[in-house]
Amino acid sequence: MTLLEQRAVEASSIQSSPFLVRHIGPSFEDQQQMLLELGHRDLQSFVAAVVPPDILETTAPTSSLPEGCGEVQAMEELRLIAAANRVRRSLIGLGYYGTATPALIQRQVLENPAWYTAYTPYQAEISQGRLEALFNFQTLISELTGLPIANASLLDEGTAAAEAMSLSFAICKRPQAHRFLVDAEVLPQTLAVLRTRAEPLGIHLEVAEPMTFQFDAEVFGVLLQLPGRSGRLWDPTTSIQAAHEVGALATVAIDPLAQVLIAPVAEFGADIAVGSVQRFGVPMAFGGPHAAFFATLEIFKRQVPGRLVGQSVDAEGQPALRLALQTREQHIRRDKATSNICTAQVLLAVMASFYAVHHGPDGLAAIARRVLLLRAQLERGLHQLGYPVQSIARFDTIEVICREAPAVHQAAALAGFNLRVLPLGVAPEAAHGFGISFDELSTDQELKSILQILAEAAGQPVPVLEDLGNPHLEELVGLPLRQRPWLQQQVFHRYRSETELLRYLQRLVGRDLSLVHGMIPLGSCTMKLNAAAELIPISWREFAALHPFAPQDQCHGYQRLVQDLEHWFAEITGFAGVSLQPNAGSQGELAGLLVIRAWHHSRGEQQRDVCLIPTSAHGTNPATCVMAGLRVVPVACDAEGNVDLNDLASKAEAHAPQLAALMVTYPSTHGVFEPQIREICELVHGHGGQVYLDGANLNAQIGFCRPGTYGADVCHINLHKTFCIPHGGGGPGVGPIAVAAHLMPFLPGHPLAACGGEQGIGAISAAPWGSAGILPISWMYLRMMGAEGLRQASAVALLSANYLAHRLHPHYPVLFRGQAGLVAHECILDLRPLKRSAGLEVDDIAKRLMDYGFHAPTVSWPVAGTVMVEPTESESLEELNRFCDAMIAIREETAAIESGQIDPQNNPLRRAPHTLAAVTAEVWDRPYSRAEAAFPLAEQRQSKFWPAVSRIDNAYGDRNLLCSCPSVEELADNSVLKPPLV
């Protein structure tokens, strides 16, 4: 192809997708320069050299994918789709409630790329802002529950309850213990997730009223709901004590708004508390994303699932925050991990923490009190109207069984309200009852409207209610109230004015490095552009305010959105069916393996329980296998980083009768397209197994090869990687699965929505379509890029990675290469020689990169002592060169150590990163200059990102674990570290 022809192709692509040139970083001329350096004449021939010929598709799939367009057209089309959602006032409850997101939090956090484009805070020195916000979140949860350890969020309440069940099961050492007792008042979606998670582990669920629980040595745990699904408040102390008497752990699923008023659940004896902070300022968004929480006793700190933020000290002795106790997590412990959770819901946890900062304890209590009093007034009105209402203590919800129910629902619908239909799952006209849940948005006028509806249905005059005055709240809730002051930490009192809160948010943003500052070249993470046009629609009321269990005729917009994405993802991957329910890659993995397991069981092959996993696999893979009830058998990799075919064949044959699946990542975790992927799939199929393809690296394949056509049976897709949902500092994510036709009947279902297959595995996530509220992001990306644009993006992602490998190879060995000496979309740089020659660890390079203004690549994975670099298609040639210049300059610094020019212990690498405070200190006792420390590149004198703290002492933080802000009393004790916030 001549240069003129290439320009014509580019012009055609730009015309068909005006957004394309905004998304792809290198210009056409830049791409030509990069290709020239790599020895290729055009992108087409370059891609043909990278992708194995037996899987390469020469044209983009187009049967269902649209042509690309500009952001204005895409947004207009999405506006029409959104308009098909009819937002009514939903008083359904069941874990999802109306809430008011403070405008400042919406504008400065949810819609702020400085917050939503950051990565999980593994590099803590440049992540102090969101670590502080998460520290506040953990403090909030710990104070709410009275439990000393709280994590930094989980995916949803159902998942959190399942993790509590798993922890209780793992802690119990009695071999006969296999029974988990569940409160009959638990939320239906939570019960569904529990059932899905319990069966593969051999756990027997028993659902009953807590007063009828049968305790014996076979019981390892209980789950109680407070308040219950019907709104009931009750004292769980007796049930918890009974559990403890047989050595079982007690988990209580709580409503955080109710917990604001009542005594902390720890005072009733709970070992674990779980729940969702959705009603703390996070929109319902048709089911998610929302941050769940998990709090427990200190003795279980090493079994807690998910991330845990702890306080330590830096090299200057100053307090600093970092992720604590990481050795319990999947990326280190693999199949021995406490959980497979990786991405959680950091952005939503941050929003909830700022909601608490915004309102403070008094503001939260005022909201909870208003909700409680409205419920009490409604109950009085129901009694006056003659409705049969049980006289029990409640918080926000009342359920009524009555013959007038169909008329109540009809009148409510005409007035613009959705009420809970009882029994759950039936049509309103067939209802035997109704439920009403008040929330933060409820008002006296809303109560009057509801009473008018109820009066009309009952044929009675509207009751006139006297003001309750100042009632004793303890009589209304039937439980001890919170007695001691809570949330007394300064952060929950200092920022009452919007001016002060705005400045606090801005101070925290300044302590975090995100994509607004520069490239984040994390391998296997795909930190690409999250365009503003893609993010704007998630705040539209039509998407943000819809209840996940609203009547189907109000949700046509979401139905269209889901349908489009399912069709497009099926086309892109070459599969027959898609489920959007998994709300993280880890949950996509679990869903995929459970689908495979269900298929085997449907064929009478229950003995198939072995999963082959390459030793290079991501830690979530083996951790997920264990959760799916499968046994992990490792498969070796050869010297080139590929799956060892001989070892695979040997293991597959040895375990043939028990072989359930192979989990394989493609391109491999070593960053190459393995040429024998078809042979691998055929080998596994030949022994009766299925092939699960981890889609973490799908960005290298779009438009050029499809897992469903080269042999995989199921694949999960990370929308927060390949399809532009931002990482949010550690979530939200979406991890749909795409499956072959024979697996479609087993796609996950849900008890309250029509989704999944006829023999579906059950709910993986609490909401039917998982984190539906952020699906518009991926819809916008796909709509604007179009089939050819997606193909172009993958080509440039491959080109950029190979350009980096080419430029850096003279300075750092590139560990693995595929055919023609090329890598895929990422490359691994070997830093191990520097340990031998200069005494440097990979962490020294990672921390020094901060001084150059970069987040480090993925460190020591999949090979210890290396970094894995993934530039994505969105970074410009200028930015790629800036990163290369930084890495080359660092190599020159290491050479100075090797030659003896600088001290091997006291040098810019071993002392990195360098803070503004350190560089401007009165005393400078280092053998290199302040300029060498802070401005290693001349351009940094014009624009410089400063690490907030010096290198953090991780070991100190784990030995002296502190996971929440100290109280005023604790701060008076000099043995407690001062919190980082001033």
UniProtKB/Swiss-Prot annotation:
Among InterPro entries, the record links this protein to:
GcvP, GDC-P_C, GDC-P_N, GDC_P, PyrdxlP-dep_Trfase, PyrdxlP-dep_Trfase_major, PyrdxlP-dep_Trfase_small
- Give the catalysed reaction(s), semicolon-separated: N(6)-[(R)-lipoyl]-L-lysyl-[glycine-cleavage complex H protein] + glycine + H(+) = N(6)-[(R)-S(8)-aminomethyldihydrolipoyl]-L-lysyl-[glycine-cleavage complex H protein] + CO2
Q: Name one GO molecular function term.
A: glycine dehydrogenase (decarboxylating) activity
According to its UniProt record, this protein's enzyme class is oxidoreductase
UniProt xrefs under Pfam families: GcvP2_C (PF21478), GDC-P (PF02347)
A Gene Ontology CC term for this entry?
Answer: glycine cleavage complex
* UniProt GO BP: glycine decarboxylation via glycine cleavage system
UniProt keywords (A-Z) are: Oxidoreductase, Pyridoxal phosphate
Where does the record place the modification N6-(pyridoxal phosphate)lysine? 721
> What function does this protein fulfil?
The glycine cleavage system catalyzes the degradation of glycine. The P protein binds the alpha-amino group of glycine through its pyridoxal phosphate cofactor; CO(2) is released and the remaining methylamine moiety is then transferred to the lipoamide cofactor of the H protein.
- Describe its assembly: The glycine cleavage system is composed of four proteins: P, T, L and H.
By sequence similarity, the record places it as follows: Belongs to the GcvP family.
According to UniProt, the name of this protein is Glycine dehydrogenase (decarboxylating)
Its source organism is Prochlorococcus marinus (strain MIT 9303)
Phylogenetic placement of the source organism: Bacteria, Bacillati, Cyanobacteriota, Cyanophyceae, Synechococcales
